């Protein structure tokens, strides 16, 4: 279910502070906040989003505005479907 428009977007306060401080920096901002929404202020900033094991660098562009950070750092690794174990035929 989508968030109500009257409530506005949710962004962790500490993440907003870090984005404002690192305006021209190339160093990625490390965050565990996958639930934060991407704002227009974050465009052009590299944010390292935690996926449960390590931080995945995400370069934010204009198409990502309105989505959440967790959408761009997948948590599961897909190994492929069953398939044939005899690959010699």
Curated annotation (Swiss-Prot):
SUPFAM superfamilies with a match to the protein in the record: Ribosomal protein S19
Keyword Lipid biosynthesis among UniProt keywords: no
Key words, A-Z: Ribonucleoprotein, Ribosomal protein, RNA-binding, rRNA-binding
Keyword Iron-sulfur: no
GO cellular component, one term: small ribosomal subunit
GO BP term (any one): ribosomal small subunit assembly
GO molecular function: rRNA binding; structural constituent of ribosome
Function: Protein S19 forms a complex with S13 that binds strongly to the 16S ribosomal RNA.
HAMAP family cross-referenced by the UniProt entry: Ribosomal_uS19
Stated family: Belongs to the universal ribosomal protein uS19 family.
NCBIfam families to which the protein is assigned, alphabetical: rpsS_bact (TIGR01050)
Name the record gives this protein: Small ribosomal subunit protein uS19
């Amino acid at each position: 279910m989508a968030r109500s428009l009257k409530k506005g977007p949710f962004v962790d306060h500490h993440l907003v502070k870090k984005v404002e401080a690192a305006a021209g920096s190339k160093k990625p901002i490390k965050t565990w906040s996958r639930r934060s929404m991407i704002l227009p202020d974050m465009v052009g900033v590299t944010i390292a989003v935690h996926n449960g094991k390590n931080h995945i660098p995400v370069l934010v562009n204009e198409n990502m505005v309105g989505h959440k950070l967790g959408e761009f750092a997948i948590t599961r690794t897909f190994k492929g479907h069953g398939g044939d174990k005899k690959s010699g035929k």
